[in-house]
Amino acid sequence: MRRLDAIIFDFDGTLADVPLDFDFMKTKIAALGEVFMDERPVPDGTPALEWLDRLSAQVMERDRDEGMEFLSRGRLVIAAMELDAARDGCLYEFTRPVLDDLKARGVAPGVISRNISAAIKKVFPDIEDHLQVFIPRESADRLKPDPAHLLQALERIGVKPGRALMVGDHPMDVETGKRAGAMAAGVTTGRIGAEGFAHLEPDFVASDVAALMSELKRSGLI
C-alpha cells in the first residue's frame, strides 16, 4: 500500500470539542420558519444548512423577497450559534502535534468544514499555520457530503484522491471520502460510535485522531 500524500480532517468533533447543538439549531430555524410559512416546519433528518435552503426555497416559490429574507435570517441564526459554541470549545491536545508531525513526514494536512472560519478560529486561532489547505463553509464551492468539498481541497494542494485520507467524526465525513475516491476514516470523539460508521465500510475507525495516526504509522501509510 502506497504512503498517503494528504490527510484531510473535519474540524468539530474531530480536531476540537465544540458543543454545538444541531437539534436546537433546527428548533430555532423552525421557529423562524413559522414567521414566513403557513405553519411551523417540523425538523427531519436533513442537516440544518440543507433544511434551511429547502425551506427558504419553498417560501421563494410564493414570494422571492420573503424567501431571501428567511434565508438571510436563518443563516445568521446558524452563524450565531456556531460562534457561541466556539466560545465554549477547546482544541484536543493531540491536534497541533498531529498536524505538525504530518507536515514533518511530508504528508499534507488539511481541514474542510461545514462551519464558518470565524467560529473555527475562535477555537484554533493559528489553524492555517498548521495546515496546507483550509476550506471552511464560506470558501467551499459545495459542502460535504458533496465530494466537491474534498476534491476542492485536494486540487488546491495537487493531490490525487487515491493518495488521500478523509477523517471525521460523522458518517458524512466517511461518505465524502468514499464518494471522492479517497480513503476514509471515522473517529469516535463526536456523537457517533464505531457501529455508526459500519454501514459505510470505512478504511479505518479509531477512538480519536491520535489513535488513528498510530494505526496509519503501523500500516506504513504515513
Protein language model features and the residues they cover:
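Short, flexible loop segments at the rims of nucleotide/cofactor-binding pockets, characterized by
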Residues: 85-90, 112, 142, 183-184
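Charged, low-complexity surface patches
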Residues: 67, 91, 113, 166, ...
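Conserved phosphate-coupling serine/threonine residues in phosphotransfer and NTP-handling enzymes
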Residues: 14, 113-115
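N-terminal helical cap/lid subdomain that shapes the substrate entry/recognition surface
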Residues: 1-96, 100-105, 121
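Structured loop/turn residues at secondary-structure junctions
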Residues: 18-21, 112, 169, 189
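Asp-based, Mg2+/Mn2+-dependent phosphohydrolase catalytic module
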Residues: 1-5, 97-104, 117-222
